Amino acid sequence: ITLPDCIIQKTSFLKNGGRIIELDNENILLSVGDFLRPLLAQNKERLFGKTLKINVKNKSINIFTSGHRNPQGLYIDKSGTIYASEHGPRGGDEVNILKDGSNYGWPQASYGTQLKFADQGDQWQLPHNIFGHDNFTEPLHAFVGSIGISQIIKYEHAYFENWKNDLFVASMGF
């Protein structure tokens, strides 16, 4: 895939979350929500519901991870571990460790339950194994009961020793 002027045209005002961070000197990571098109998160030909690795030198795009609903935060720690936070549907907000080629399951796997919207886009049904991630990458942590998760960071300093290497997530409310 090569980089167009606009990677994704707006298709919905819901579930279009995302974050952008610098991966290294040549690449950025861009997380993209499913824009109310849940089935596209598993479609390898589409960019919805993915974390994209974009090479800024040659303008190529590769799908880094897939199976995302509504990503909100990205953070790379000093060791190179990539953390992501993501809204679940009704509950099931996730903290994930992103690894190249991994699939986090949306919409076939979720720790949340189905939300009803007037315009829900592609319809999806709850997976047979609700509250599981069979055949998909499990989240590091799932909030069952939504916290409205947002940005994520890892505290890597020594000033507050009790918090060293702890993850912090922002919340839009309980």
Predicted regions and their residues:
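Beta-propeller domain segments
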Residues: 34-174
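Hydrophobic residues embedded in beta-strands of well-ordered beta-sheets
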Residues: 27-28, 82
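Alpha-helix capping at helix-to-loop junctions
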Residues: 22-25, 56-57
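Asp-box/WD-like beta-propeller blade repeats and closely related beta-sheet repeat scaffolds
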Residues: 1-22
